[in-house]
Amino acid sequence: MKNVYTGESDEHIIGNIPIKSINIAYLILVHRLPDQFKKLFKAIYEPSNFYLIHIDKKASEQIGEEVTDFLKNYPNAHILKSENVIWGGYSMVQAELDGMKYLLEMDTRWDYFINLSGQDYPLKSQKIIREFLSQNNGKNYIKVVDQEKKRPETMNRIENYFEETGDRISDKTHKRDFMKNVTPYIGGQWMILTRSCCEFITNNIEVKKFEEYYLNTLIADESFFQTVLMNTSFNGILINDDKRAIIWIPDGDIKLRPKTFTETDLKFLQTGNHLFARKFDDNVDDKIIDNIKTQYDQPFKTFAKIIDIKSLNKTFNHLN
């Protein structure tokens, strides 16, 4: 039976507890601002963790060389073969899947997979993050809601045929029937997943039909993983929370984009129970990260309540 954590109950404090040794495998997606990436990398670096960096094929040769040269000093950091990642295309999902597979095939043992962009930054130290994952070992963190019931305006993304052509999504599309006996789910791109969850996603034969269908959908990175985990025999615990602090603002007629944080957002970043925030740009505000660091090792409260998967649709009303 799948369970989903959605409510607030069973308070406990992270920051002063004995921890099981938790090793983290990070996948970091980089396409610009190499100095911002370096700042992120140094903030999350631990010798016992593992780091896989994907540099977008569209990134300049200079960025690729700068990032590659920087990582030479870190033996537990690797570079993934570049994918031409197109906004809205399945190529983003493919980069994530390739990253999971690469990390699973490494001759090392890790417990959790966390994906980040090069403009993310941690709100807590690795000590606090590892304590949190130790206390909640076995739980998977990913935003998930019933797409048709809670985000009906996005159904066109999966009920039409889309195709990547060159560096964009083709304007030509046509309607098609969605997958039979499958309930579509949606959430966000960012995840904190157990190793066993990654093994299921990359190795289980049930996932193949989802890969084939979602190859020609729009913004698949926000719904592919959710739909797979909610419509297969995967039996892990899913928590409707990606532990990311993001403020979404309008960007044109059809999409939102994450606000670039400034010092005016500091209270928002310091009062939540998030582990990471997106996004930052020192060219916009080069002081905000220094202020965040002052609370790196302060414990934070986290709340959880197990809800049976059958009650899922009744429990998300307060999130929309």
Predicted regions and their residues:
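ER/Golgi luminal nucleotide-sugar-dependent glycosyltransferases, focusing on the catalytic module
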Residues: M1-N320
